[in-house]
Amino acid sequence: ARDLYDPNLYHKTYLVPPAGHPDYWEEIERIVDQHNIEMALVQPELEVLTWAKRLEEKGKLPCKALLPGYTLAQQLTDKGMMTDILKDTGWVPPSVLIEPDSDTLAETVAQLGYPFWIRATSGSSGLGSLKVENEAALRNWIHINPKVRQFIGSQYLPGRNLACKLLYFEGQLLRAACAERVNYIMAKVAPSGITGNTSFGRLLNEPGLVDTATQAMDRLFAHAKAPKHGFFTVDFKEDAAGQPYITEVNVRHVAFSVCFAAGGATFAEDTVRLLDGDATFDRSYRMYEFEKDLIFLRDVDAQPLLLRESQLLN
């Protein structure tokens, strides 16, 4: 990646073993010690799982980090497991697990009917995602995604694609904010149109969405017997009538966090102040509210823009 070599973005970059590798922690600890690193922003999902597991097993980390409990992280990075925990709440769409080698594939997806939405149960950036119109398309999609061990099929939801960010710290929900993903960077290279990187989005004020997200998180915390601690992005998709359903819960910041910050939702700064024990930080709950009509535009290797939707060229 070009930007890894840009000294204006990073003081130093390293190539390290992947999370889970036997030499991973030795290298991470060496870097932390060498640079006296006090805090880490841990992502993507595999890194979060690895760090959360280390914290659970060892009781400490090389430096401070805001992490969910390990069991909770496991449940949330598996979309099938997360959906199953919430299946009786009305907050998730009707869904079925799809085993690629199953002899009852047609019978399984018949519960949903066509079209439906398919994706991998784990992974990010829209891995394995497609609107499936018929059985032939389903079988072809499974065939060209041989590395996906399990899919989840869900009711097709044609409405808005929403995200609700939630910052929990030591048992309290402290900050929240919402946005809409409208278009994706390089959308044409993915059959589903979803690449995981938003190119055009809206910053929204949606207290009802926050309410649903926090109720769902309450159940997920309880199921995992986990403390309310960590940073989460709850993704929603609306049906044709505008009813939102939870499609996944990310255990990390998402790519357009900088756009939230530009609009005033400074989650990264909040996290640093909390981890640093800043006594002046206001721990009363706050949903960040944005000015009306705010949108953001992003692209590869370019600074994002924040402007009003009314300013877009017609």
Segments (PLM) and residue ranges:
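Glycine-rich phosphate-binding loop signature in dinucleotide/nucleotide-binding domains
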Residues: 31-37, 111-112, 146-147
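Conserved ATP-binding module of the ATP-grasp superfamily
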Residues: 92-94, 115-117, 127-160, 217-224
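Short acidic-hydrophobic, aromatic-tinged amphipathic segments that line or gate anion-handling sites
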Residues: 13-20, 96-100, 130-133
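ATP-binding N-terminal substructure of ATP-dependent carboxylate-amine bond-forming enzymes
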Residues: 1-67, 103-106
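ATP-dependent carboxylate activation and anion-phosphoryl transfer catalytic cores
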Residues: 35, 207-314
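ATP-dependent carboxylate/phosphate-activation module, predominantly the ATP-grasp catalytic core
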Residues: 155-161, 165-222, 250-275
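A conserved helix-loop-beta module that forms one wall/lid of the active-site cleft
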Residues: 59-128
